[in-house]
Amino acid sequence: MLPSASVRFRKNAAPPGDSRAIWSQRPRNGGTSAGGRLGYALKNTTNFPCLQGGCKKTEFSIVSFAIGGEIWYTILLIDLRLGIEGVFIHKLAEKKEAPYLEKLDGVRFKMAAPFDFSFLKRYGKVFKVYDDQDSGNICFGVRNENGKRVFVKFAGAPTARYTGQKEDAIASLKNASGLYRALTHENLIRLIESREMGGGWASVFEWTDAICLGRQYPEQHAAFVKLPTETRMKVYRDILYFQSFAAKKGYVAVDLYDSTVMYDVENRRTVLCDIDFYRKMPTVNDMGQMWGSARFMSPEEYELGAVLDEVTNVYTLGAMAFALFSECDRSAEAWPLSSNLYAVAKKAVSEERSARYESIDALLSAWETARGEEL
């Protein structure tokens, strides 16, 4: 018997590339249960374990295929506890025409349509472009004639992946500038200025040569996970201390995941580079599915009306420990550190809020205690 397409997928693991749209929520766009009666050409098949309670209890098989110019996925769910099997067909995205190719100072990048970026000249010449964003922002590395580099985040241009309204992207980036000022910290990227320009809004930050933990940057991710264990321990403590600082200032982290964490190897500095969606507490889930990566999101971040607070962030920070030390694998077998530290991380990612640590400071204290016992 096949369950209906409204069955919600577990979110303890995510496939490479973080295909969160299909992994973490009910099928969209009229997803149907198996049977399909749709002709398709198989592209690839990958199996992923979903780790629950420290053992492999649920398995997914994800197959991508194309139907009439659209990209779809089938998702085979096998629950080893209940013996239920189901196949879901999910429309992933419309196939679009090749995006417009823009060029600035010899650097090519993708856009949905032409746009005038001449306002960037006030900061110098573009040497790097980050165009693969779905937030409505496009980011630039710009260097002036004296060699000073800055990072410019801009909203208001027709980026290749954004499907929302230009005005929403501008409002979001404008609002975020206040967060960087309110949470100024040695481990947060420094905001230089944020203002209207180029028909949109730009925030200008100090440049950093730090490498990113995020999987969307494979070479940097590979370099990050090869850092010595002690270095990654320092990175994790820095993340905990910053989130504790933010909580004391009255903020809850939203959209905190591996791609927001960087490490400057030369200066031995952890850098948090994106707090755009942090919120002032008290706050609740008003979206149904909050911004974020499925590998880091707590159950309440999928529940409309649920409270979002420090306990929510305890879950995310537990998930961050698994990202830093075991490539997001939550099994005891994959954990390279002590069993005491594993117990701390595992408690933090408990599905039930009451089973987690009651605050970020409590998580930090438990981690430091377990670390001390290891030495």
Feature annotation, model-predicted:
Residues 190-201:
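Short beta-strand micro-motifs within the conserved protein kinase catalytic domain, predominantly
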Residues 243, 247-263:
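Catalytic-loop of the protein kinase fold
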Residues 287-301:
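Conserved activation segment of eukaryotic-like protein kinases, specifically the C-terminal portion
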Residues 136-172, 178:
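ATP-binding glycine-rich loop module of kinase domains
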Residues 264-291:
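Activation segment/activation loop of eukaryotic-type protein kinase catalytic domains
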Residues 86-125:
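Juxta-kinase regulatory segment immediately upstream of eukaryotic protein kinase catalytic domains
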Residues 199-212:
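Conserved short submotifs of the Hanks-type protein kinase catalytic core
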